[in-house]
Amino acid sequence: MALMIAPSVQWEQLTGQLRSAVPEAFGSDGNPLNLIEGQWSHSGNGKRYATAVDGSELGRIPMIDLETAKRAVKFAANEHESWTRVDLDERRRRVSVCLDLLRAHRNLISYLLMWEIGKPLNLAQDDVDRCISGVEWYVEQIEPMLAGRTPLGLISNIASWNYPYSVLMHAVLVQALAGNAVIAKTPTDGGLFSLTIGFALARRCGLPVSLVSGSGGALSEALVRNQDVAALAFVGGKSNGRDIAASLYDRDKRYMLEMEGVNCYGIWDYSNWNDLAAQIKKGYAYGKQRCTAYVRFVVRRSLLPRFLDAYLPVLKSLKIGNPLLVDSPDAPLPLLDFGPLINPRKVEELRVMYSEAVGAGAINLFEGELNEDRFLPGQDISAYLAPISLLNVPRNCRLHHNEPFGPIDSIVVVDRVEELISEMNISNGNLVSSIACDDPTTAREIGAELRSFKVGINQMRSRGDNDEVFGGMGASWKGCFVGGSYLVQSVTCSKPGERPYGNFPDYTLLPERR
């Protein structure tokens, strides 16, 4: 039977459900509005908003101007003053009601995420579930975290498109729970519709949240440098992150800037290849479009044949395709490793990096192909990229020093432990690293030399949930660390002159357990 878009995820049906659930958040043309000054308004200049799944237009994203954003920030900062008079029990109650509403709309939000950012169903559901369970944990645990601390003020959030709920919505709700007013910018590349319902439900529950959309550069003066913003939470690339960091260093403002580094997996005197293969396969979730993806494997030369025996079959087994397709109306949505990348521009960027590396002498170990049976006939597949793996990428290539943020791996062969450590520290600071080694002592010794915030031994590390701290070393992270009590500390203050845990220009203070 021919493939079709599953009836349960037809876009027209989903947007109908969405407008019925939160009609106040949509204009007369059916497109989302911004949540400014406590009201859904300001359609701005609508910009085409398309899905990477098949290139079709989903709607128009409102692009507001700087002055409108400044008004939104001014109102949100004033709203903080009244929010500080709401006690913790009431804040808990309102956040809990919001979580109940999010849970009731879980399927709708998950389906929206599939269209907006191309996640297969299981990953889209996981994004929503981790948001809900994570904020629930804070509702239960936050009271001792707030002892002796007061909220900072208005928190501004500028986040990437890849985790609209488990990162952005989660942070917003915890920041409000801690007593702060919150404003966020919708990621331009994805999350417009899914975040619109989340913020509409939060606003209905009496939470002091605002949502704006527009060009990051155009709105930076309002959302970053504005004196009414007490703290900034940023998730994105190094180039934008560096510019933001430079604008904040001489200002009395808290910041948490999560950027990227090259996350490496080192293989040294290791034998459990089946376990490593399972880790590698899991690591391909969402096409490695996340800041904690492992994109570089540094392998002892004598182990390279056995490593490739475990590694290459994983790449051949990966299932990539349109996540919305079924072969009959009542069939379940497909189980895929990943769908499209976020847009065709990203695919083109990765192909250029790949061509540059091969042209400079890198060895092409694997170049996957898309299976046409996982797409509609004639559909746009320009945002899809099968996995690629390169051996010995020359040092003068961008792939050697930069995180690809997509399904391109690089393999480096070394002979000595010192080389292993040097190659794993290529970006002079990153978020996660791992060592595969049969000897725990050797693994710990190597791990101690890595410029990585988290180091795993025979396992991959990730952002983590609940009480697990998250941060980065070197250029991969600037400002306060987050996760567990550190997230609450980052948006509250105690005594004057407090030195938060984090990575700052004049000091780095690391948690004992990470």
Indicate residue ranges for each PLM-predicted region:
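Conserved C-terminal structural/oligomerization subdomain of aldehyde/semialdehyde dehydrogenase
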Residues: 1-4, 56-60, 89, 228-229, ...
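N-terminal Rossmann-like NAD(P)+-binding subdomain of aldehyde/semialdehyde dehydrogenases
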Residues: 2-146, 317, 342
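Residue-level signal for inorganic ion chemistry
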Residues: 38, 55, 76, 91, ...
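Short acidic active-site motifs
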Residues: 68, 218-221, 419
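Structural signal for hydrophobic packing residues in well-ordered secondary-structure cores
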Residues: 80, 84, 99-106, 110-113, ...
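Rossmann-like NAD(P) dinucleotide-binding subdomain of oxidoreductase/dehydrogenase enzymes
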Residues: 142-277, 332, 414
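Structural detector of well-ordered beta-strand residues that form the stable sheet scaffold
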Residues: 176, 183, 210, 256, ...
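ALDH superfamily catalytic-core signature
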Residues: 204, 239-394, 457, 502-514
